[in-house]
Amino acid sequence: FENILLAVKQKRSILKMLFRKFQSNSSESSFVYQTLNQLSLETLGTKVASTLSHGDKRKLELAMALAMGPKILLLDEPFAGLDQAESSKLIELLKSIKKNMPIFLIEHDMQAVFALADKISVLNEGEIIESGSVEKIRRSKLVQNAYLGGDL
């Protein structure tokens, strides 16, 4: 949350925070608006980041990342601290993003991984113990024993 905390500390609105990066380029400013609209965050533009829900802060982090125009989106534990409703909304949002951009997801919430992934690699103590489709990982006794001690 480094960028969001900066906005909170400085009491900047979200739009001011995003536009700070793009002050001189109107096409980039337009892209910021498009990104906010794509993530259904257009109504948050005038709010201060400290007033947002945890889920909206996660969406804002995505907007900030997407505003940079990446070719791939790297997400590290995006579901940490979210309740079930916020997680579900974020899953749907990421499903729409992954249609246009590859996502590399690092996540412990296997249900979120199963909902989003096409291919999965499971690590245990720094080593890949299984790799493959969602179904292969669901059926893997190695993964079940390493993480759940039973069925996924």
Regions found by a protein language model. Give the residues of each.
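Hydrophobic anchor residue at the start of the ABC signature
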Residues: 62
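Conserved ABC nucleotide-binding domain
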Residues: 15, 35-56
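Helical segment within the ABC ATPase nucleotide-binding domain
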Residues: 88-99
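ABC ATPase "signature
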Residues: 131-132
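A short, surface-exposed alpha-helical micro-motif characterized by mixed small hydrophobic
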Residues: 113-115
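Catalytic Walker B motif of ABC-type/P-loop ATPase nucleotide-binding domains
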Residues: 73-77
